[in-house]
Amino acid sequence: MKCREIIEILETLAPKSCACDWDNPGLLAGRMDKDVEKILLTLDADDAAVERAKEIGADMLLSHHPLIFKPVKHVSDEDFIGRRLVSLIQADVSYYAMHTNFDSAPGCMADIVADRLNFVDQKPLELMGELSGTAYGIGKTGTLKKPMTGPELAREVKNRFGLPFVTVYGSELYENEPVTRAATCPGAGGSEIREALRAGAQVFI
């Protein structure tokens, strides 16, 4: 399959128009007409991921966080961004990133997290727009299908996502009281805390 065809599939799933204005998703290096048989998925296009892609003979590297956010004035091996780009291009590995568009698009990260936690009455935490009549945005807010205490919810999150542990701040607030409304954000989430409070969330995940 051509790189172009894979990108068409990815952008049908998570259109670049769903990304935040400051973001930079898309094909960041490589050839559109590249024949792709093997893809390496990674959170970050760091040195280890780039070397691993070359080691396994990957034709395409797909990351969540873009390697390039700001305009690049030069590409050389004198800085970490240039070094990785040069390495990928020399190895003929096409590099694509899908970040906040994948976080926010309908059916993607925000929906997956909320569905796995059985949220009802789901709404985008930060509304960004509509796609085919469906509202989308960063994060989700909703009512828990079954009220539970803070510790119970922490265990639910841990189990639902197969995590070795979770970190809880303010655990004493709902230690013995039921949580009925929660909000999630598939990222750092610092800028969404106020939105979570406005939405009436008792817990922010």
Q: What are the roles of these predicted feature ranges?
A:
Residues 1-205:
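Hydrophobic structural segments
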